[in-house]
Amino acid sequence: VPRVPTTADVNNPKRKGYDFRLDNLLFRTATSTDRQLVIRTAEFPNQQIDLRQNPEDITTNIGQIFSRNDFSGGQGLDFAHKRNNVEKDTTRFFDSKGVDVFHGDDETSYNVHLLFTTENKDVKGTTADFSSTNNYLIKTANNNLYVSDDTTIYESTDGGDSWNAMTPSITISYAIQGMAPFGNGFFFVTGDGSTGKQLCHYTGSAWHVESLSTTFSGYFTGIWYEKDKLIVSGKSTTAEYLFEADPFDHSFSFPAAGAIITTDPDYKFTSVTDAGAVILAANENGKIYSLKDVTGSLQLQGQTRIPFEEVHSIVASEGIVFFGTKEATRDVGRFYKAELVTADNLYVLANRQLIKEWVIDSIDTTPHAMFASRDSVYCSVQEATDETYLWRYYLPTAGFARDLKLGAGGLCYGISQGSGKFVASISGKNVYKETSSYESEGYIITPNIDFFTSEIKQWVGTTVEHDEITDSRRIQCFISTREGTIDTPGSSSWELTNDSTQGFGGTEFQINRNARYLNMKIVLTPTIDFTGTPVFRSVSARALPRPQLVVIDIPVNISDQVERPNRKRIKVRNLGETVYQELKQKEGDSVTLELYDPAELIRGVVESVAYPVINHANIGSVTQYCTVRIRGVRAEDITSEFTNIIGIGTLGVVGLG
């Protein structure tokens, strides 16, 4: 009875005249000049997905294009092509440093440029740092700036450029614990950590130690001025208190029984802000309290708990509340936004959304100070022992990105502006002010790009466009095909492609990389004297599909006659029919095809088995054959991974078969 031989029956099948195997079945081909074995790449199907990122990507060039000409959506996008992408993602990127991606302060068309640096203003007149850590920074109505250091207050009347120690006519007996601007002057409170305390007032010309009648037994820990009221916090051995006071009545009383809020003494109030309908007070106990003015007095009218977190800063802008927290058990900082809503006559924060989390070993990344401008909210975050950054939330696009770099590491105790420039106080360090010199380098890192497919692509080229460069400014584009490279801006995996030192850019640089992903880092460098910045407009990358699918057409010998090398041919009745029926049974099945010459290993499916054809050659024997079509992908033989192992690679498989 004829049957189809298998690999278990035949050793070294190639030597015995077999040309290929399907799984474990062995077959002979019937190739000749008019019936060839053909291996070809399958046509790449058109994807029914619009992969253009922007309307500008409509082009006559072949391939798929990713581009960014607007980065105002902010950072944090790690993969550009995801199933749950939203419209905003077309303007987002992964990370940036030293560049302004929002362009909110200029009246020119959108572009990306370098940010200004900041400089140490040497408040104490020398290179010495502050002597304490409670370095509160405020700005009064006449644009003067003040910063505290232990019991000393320094004043700047020129927007923070120069500072002088003030000589008050009063004795500041204890360390300053908080300052609140009031007109051209300010109130401040002191405390010694026990029961010593003062409430003081500087009018802009005169100093006063306010009279305290009935007070709690403890010391002051903070002061704020909101809705024409002074909000004062204090701590005793049994509780932390929050009081209200009238700044126009110079007879102050802070009895424990008169506190608006009484909380656990292990925590303190950290920040207070006017949120419109109510005043919000943040506490390290993870609660945000809502204080409403009822017939002239503040009353607790709701509270919101942030589980397992300490709230250290809070500000409200355009009806949105922003607050910064620290995880209760780790130095992990988080930045949230929420909405103030009314529920059963109580004011609470709802729709809370985490915007950013900072996890850096051995660094307290708590957003410790906030500042609200016309279109943005800024918070400060320490990211290294010698680096603190302002992060900017841009209200028009809800984008969030790193902004100015402050020249020291530490918690920020105040952010303000002087003469149109940012001024910030770093605890235990100094005051830093924005300059008119650009950063020495800035970058934007794009998300990973894969055009919604896991297949390998042929990355053809990258293009960078910018304003004309005629001097020492420079824009470079680096690429990587490893998705994890975006986490490390200084990685050696970044490869330079575009390097623009003159002209407008716009030239596609060939990159010739085969990979699933591509990501890009665009680096901006200023003029030699740091007075000019390059103006970056857009970046794009183009890829061609790299089909891995192949189609193989094999003419299979289904004759009854068997021809073997160096052997006499024999005829086996019904052998051809048996072979043909075996092939028909494989139709539609997944198989592994191994061709012996040329050596190919393909895993796929038997797409079709054609009807038998009898070929009457002019010279030679009559051959009956059928054409088998297999569609699949090339695969590496698993044994090739072990070619260094004696008995498998050297002798057992590769050498002897």
Range-by-range predicted roles:
Residues T453-D471, I475, M520-L524, P534-A541, ...:
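A short beta-strand element within beta-rich, extracytoplasmic domains
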Residues G409-N448:
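Blade-level signature of beta-propeller repeat domains, shared across WD40, Kelch, NHL, RCC1
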Residues P2-T167, G185-H208, G222-A259, F269-V278, ...:
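N-terminal beta-propeller domains
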Residues T127, T167, S211-S213, A245, ...:
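Short Trp-Ser/Thr-centered turn/loop motifs at beta-strand boundaries
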